[in-house]
Amino acid sequence: VGTRVVRIEDQQLITQGGTYVEDL
């Protein structure tokens, strides 16, 4: 219950190295 790292393969978003941090 904080943040999680999701690969762009799961969510088509690009920020750094093909991953982004989603605040929950």
Swiss-Prot record:
Q: Spell out the protein name for this chain.
A: DYE-linked aldehyde dehydrogenase, alpha chain
Q: Which cofactor does it need?
A: Mo-molybdopterin cytosine dinucleotide
Q: Report the top EC class in one word.
A: oxidoreductase
Q: Which GO terms describe its molecular function?
A: oxidoreductase activity
Q: What does this protein do?
A: Active with aldehydes and formate esters as substrates.
State the UniProt keywords alphabetically.
Molybdenum, Oxidoreductase
Q: How is the cofactor bound?
A: Binds 1 Mo-molybdopterin cytosine dinucleotide (Mo-MCD) cofactor per subunit.
Q: Tell me the subunit arrangement.
A: Heterotetramer composed of an alpha, a beta and two gamma chains.
Domain of life of the native organism: Bacteria
> What's the EC number here?
1.2.99.-
Statement: the UniProt record of this protein carries the keyword Disulfide bond: no
Claim: Oxidoreductase is one of the keywords in the record: yes
Q: Which residues form a coiled coil?
A: none
